Amino acid sequence: MRIKILLAVGLLGALSLSASAQEESQGVTPEIYYLMSDFGDGMVWFSDQGPAQGKMNICAEDNSLRYLDKNGQEVVASSIDNVVKVQIDTAVFIRNEGVFYRIYPVSDEMAVAVRRDLDIQRDAQRGAYGGYSRTSSIREYSTLYADGVAYQLAKSQKYPFTVSETCFLYTGGKIVSLSKRTLRKLFPQRKDAIDAYLKSDRSLPDKLSDVQAFLQRLASGETL
């Protein structure tokens, strides 16, 4: 299989240089702003051509694919409509409806797919006492659970932001919701156990580690 080098001009359409990381991310740490903590050895798979490789990362704010050119400059791929899969180091991402999901295998047939949503509130205005009008000044990350989603609230150096990570399922080549209906369909032999679990005033897990453990118990026949 012939592998193209991602740095070839035109491979991903027109390319544009990004702003500096500090300027663009408005003080949000790389671990939050990107789906990987650093640019790593990556491979991109396309729907209409062979794979390509290079040093790359994925931006959580706009789901853009970023990579480093031969001078170490961060570059934004302006057209990635034909990208279906990305691997950076050992992490695998599936692109679905314009969003990258990180894949965490649970079995040969199923994986947890995690989507990160980052909202940098650039329109927030400073209040009279130096805070921001859209959120309080939070120095440490804190977790807020709402609608089954874990939200991390924080104040960046320039603007407040929120970041959430939501767990889905990846099975049969598709991203599907983590819901009672989906689980009953995927585990028909465990319908009664799923119903009993939810009727006992418990909700489906939303943290990655808890979702993985829950699916493993479902698959093995263990008590939920």
Predicted regions and their residues:
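Bacterial Sec-dependent N-terminal signal peptides
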Residues: M1-S25, F214
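Residue-level marker of positions within ordered structural domains that often coincide
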Residues: A8, C59, A219
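N-terminal secretory signal peptides
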Residues: E24-E74
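Aromatic-patch recognition
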Residues: A52-V176
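A short, solvent-exposed beta-edge/loop patch
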Residues: Y151-L218
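A cross-kingdom marker for long, charged
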Residues: L218-L224
